[in-house]
Design a protein with these regions (language model features):
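C-terminal motif of bacterial Sec signal peptides marking the signal peptidase cleavage site
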Residues: 15-17
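A structural "domain/chain start" motif
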Residues: 22, 26-30, 35, 42-60, ...
Length: 247
């Protein structure tokens, strides 16, 4: 059997390039190249090819993320800080990955973005809070729901940017208060005290609160009804006995 040593050599070189992150770097996927280079160095410390890739790919990755940040900062997009947070977080993730290789300090100087992350997170939180207030002031239930989501996002960036009271106000403003009414469609039910059945079901719903829906009682003053939902039942199960069929 004739062995193709050339093919084996090419395969080995290709595998080495992939393991070191060289191929990813050549494709412009600098972040992945960094991660692959770090992984290779953890497996084989001081691997020259991986060290070279790490130095080059990290610089290229940071430059790429920084360019996006600079561009976004010049725009009038009120939510530009969302993108900037994402880009700074990607740099921070690269830094954390590189720190897992003990000898990284001899290879790269990490770009600390701690202060920048704090600043852009504040900007993102402020932008979402401002948008939430604008939506809430429209006096529209749908807008109030959107305001609630904006407030949630604000607090995801910086905790307590929006108070619990403000969140409750937005949620209440966007909530539909619903009365549930039951109607029996068969005379059969009237023979088996259907009021008791419906009453039990209604009590299970009473006071139920979903994110933007609340079940209320007729005439309840605290939460005036917005809609009435009428449920027509055709069967019931009482005490484990099936009364579906009238026979």
């Amino acid at each position: 059997m004739k062995i193709n040593y050339t093919l084996i050599l090419i395969s080995c070189l290709t595998l080495a390039a992939c393991n070191s992150g060289q191929k990813r770097m050549e494709q412009g996927d600098y972040d992945t190249a960094v991660y692959q280079a770090v992984k290779r160095l953890q497996q084989k410390p001081q691997n020259e090819k991986a060290e070279k890739v790490l130095r080059q790919a990290y610089t290229l990755a940071v430059n790429e993320h920084t360019n996006v940040i600079v561009y976004q900062d010049k725009t009038n997009n009120p939510f530009k800080y969302d993108v900037m947070v994402s880009e700074y977080e990607k740099i921070a993730m690269l830094n954390n990955a590189i720190r897992r290789y003990p000898m990284y300090k001899d290879l790269v100087e990490l770009t600390d973005v701690t202060d920048e992350l704090i600043m852009v997170r504040d900007g993102a939180a402020s932008a979402h809070r401002k948008e939430g207030v604008r939506l809430l002031n429209s006096g529209n239930k749908q807008r109030a729901r959107e305001a609630f989501i904006q407030f949630i996002k604000a607090n995801e960036y910086v905790a307590r940017t929006v108070t619990e009271e403000e969140l409750d106000n937005a949620q209440n403003a966007g909530t539909v208060n619903v009365i549930i009414q039951f109607a029996n469609s068969r005379n059969f039910f009237r023979d088996y005290n259907s009021d008791a059945v419906f009453g039990a079901v209604r009590n299970n719903f009473k006071g139920t609160r979903y994110r933007f829906m609340r079940v209320v009682e007729p005439g309840e003053l605290s939460f005036p009804a917005d809609e009435i939902v009428q449920i027509e039942m055709e069967d019931a199960h009482i005490g484990g006995v099936d009364f579906t069929k009238n026979s």
